[in-house]
Amino acid sequence: MLKNDLWINQKASEGMINPFQSNLVRHLEPNNQQKPVLSYGCSSYGYDLRLSSKEFLIFRHIPGTVMNPKKFNPDNLEKTVLHHDDDGDFFILPAHSYGLGVALEKMKVPKNITVICIGKSTYARLGIIVNTTPAEAGWEGHLTLEFSNSSGADCRIYANEGICQLLFFEGDPCTTTYKDRRGKYQNQPEKVTLAKI
């Protein structure tokens, strides 16, 4: 069953999402002015996470190399600069490229819940695809987020604003949680976690 805002708020008060925003934020009010932001916080049947400003990496081509998920070479990634202007803080994801970021919020997934992370339509309409990612029962940490820019133009990816939506699905209690089996991505810090096997 897909869980609603009442359930999300209750579980957040027990530490499921931190920091937690109980309503959907669409505007900030610095100096009493309405500043639009990419929405984040609790919605009717989900929660919009924010992208952390701490780290954003993009893939680069190294001639003569092929990326291997079993032996990932971190040299294929480069850090990007956090930019700032009147619209906010942002990273730039080049056209036809792929990047990795991390969620600002830390999560603790209950033992009978699986979370699915999906993209926001605002970014999808610009050609930015957020990889659909699960967070399994018992998983804890900051989600590493994957982004693909399928458009022919560079695109801003805003930090500290909404980047993806979480959907919470309840199932029968499982025998072994992600935490119980010591999953390889358990307790990810607020930094990009690279591929592991």
Across the structure, where does each feature detected by a protein language model lie?
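DUTPase catalytic domain/fold
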Residues: 1-197
